[in-house]
């Protein structure tokens, strides 16, 4: 008899159905589409995507930014537990945005750089949070070392973007004269190359080690989430407007899927005559879509009517919405002593 533990791959306990969870939350659909566009030689599909990309961004990404705000104000106890987030942060955001538009070369430039630097960090944090959720749902015990290594694996793609992308990240916080030094350029390029490999290798190694130990603490869907994020931030380069837009569509789908699940599962358990789950889901998405349209398509024109330039109004409104979303998102996903934990530990299926 072999003394090696039996291999047991845990697919992860889905929130809805394995196909739904793997394709939308796990990022599997994004990998299929990206692979098809990259290797499938489908010019018609590529042309359709380019033609309708900004409609997809509205339906997915704009709605997902609004979704964190809708979730904040519909989550029970938000005004009581998060008074600054619900009442003070919106006013502070408008004030900072107005000053940034009035001073685009100063505060506006830094707001834009903050948004571009924070965005891949937010992606990494979302990947880590989702991976941990499925780990909790698998029921396997997790040590602090396990969480630490999973966090490192999740944030390696962010570090790659931080060092690799121009105009933000390290180029925002370090003087250009320092970065142009030959030694600095060599260290930077070497770190970028190393992080590119580690972003894909580290999650796979953690997963394989867990299988070897026979405990299968990292579900397969958690590995898929981490690798999808590595493809988005590292594999696609995160450099051209087209690739960034494609990535934001799938990131938005991922976020909207899990956000809607949490909202609906809380609502259908409401004691006072809950409506069917599909009505709750459609109503929530409709609110996210409507608010997203107002924020991204209408709000910039308010500053144009006040006499500010169109370009800086659009760009800085987008930056302010992103930063507001990043802050809100950090608070609405708490698991301990929160209704979110009941959703994470619940059985699959919405209704």
Language-model-detected regions and their locations in the chain:
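N-terminal signal-anchor module of multipass membrane proteins
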Residues: 2-57, 330-331
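Hydrophobic core of alpha-helical transmembrane segments in multi-pass integral membrane proteins
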Residues: 23-40, 87-101, 154-166, 193-210, ...
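C-terminal ends of transmembrane helices
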Residues: 65-76, 127-133, 204-214, 325, ...
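Membrane-interface helix-loop-helix junctions at boundaries between adjacent transmembrane segments
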Residues: 77, 99-189
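Extracellular/periplasmic helix-loop-helix junctions in multi-pass membrane proteins
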Residues: 237-243, 297-316
């Amino acid at each position: 008899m072999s003394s090696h533990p039996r291999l047991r791959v845990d697919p992860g306990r889905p929130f809805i159905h394995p196909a739904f969870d793997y394709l939308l939350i796990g990022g599997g659909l994004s990998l299929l589409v990206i692979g098809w566009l990259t290797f499938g030689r489908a010019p018609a599909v590529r042309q359709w995507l380019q033609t309708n990309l900004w409609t997809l961004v509205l339906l997915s990404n704009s709605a997902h930014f609004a979704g964190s705000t809708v979730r904040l104000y519909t989550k029970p106890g938000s005004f009581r537990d998060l008074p600054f987030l619900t009442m003070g942060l919106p006013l502070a955001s408008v004030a900072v945005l107005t000053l940034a538009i009035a001073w685009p070369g100063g505060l506006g430039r830094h707001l834009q750089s903050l948004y571009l630097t924070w965005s891949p960090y937010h992606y990494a944090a979302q990947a880590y949070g989702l991976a941990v959720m499925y780990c909790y749902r698998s029921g396997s015990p997790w040590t602090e070392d396990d969480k630490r290594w999973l966090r490192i694996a999740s944030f390696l793609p962010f570090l790659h973007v931080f060092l690799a992308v121009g105009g933000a990240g390290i180029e925002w916080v370090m003087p250009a004269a320092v970065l142009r030094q030959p030694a600095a350029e060599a260290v930077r390029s070497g770190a970028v190359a190393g992080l590119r490999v580690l972003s894909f290798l580290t999650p796979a190694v953690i997963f394989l080690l867990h299988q070897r130990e026979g405990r299968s603490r990292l579900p397969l869907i958690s590995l898929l989430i981490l690798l999808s994020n590595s493809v988005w931030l590292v594999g696609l380069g995160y450099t051209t407007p087209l690739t960034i837009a494609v990535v934001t569509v799938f990131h938005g789908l991922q976020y909207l899927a899990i956000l809607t699940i949490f909202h609906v599962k809380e609502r259908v358990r409401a004691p006072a005559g809950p409506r069917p789950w599909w009505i709750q889901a459609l109503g929530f998405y409709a609110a996210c879509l409507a608010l997203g349209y107002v924020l991204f398509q209408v709000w910039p024109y308010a500053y144009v009517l006040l006499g500010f330039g169109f370009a800086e109004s659009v760009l800085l409104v987008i930056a302010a919405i992103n930063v507001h979303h990043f802050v809100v998102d950090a608070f609405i996903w708490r698991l301990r002593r929160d209704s979110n934990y009941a959703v994470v530990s619940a059985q699959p299926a919405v209704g």
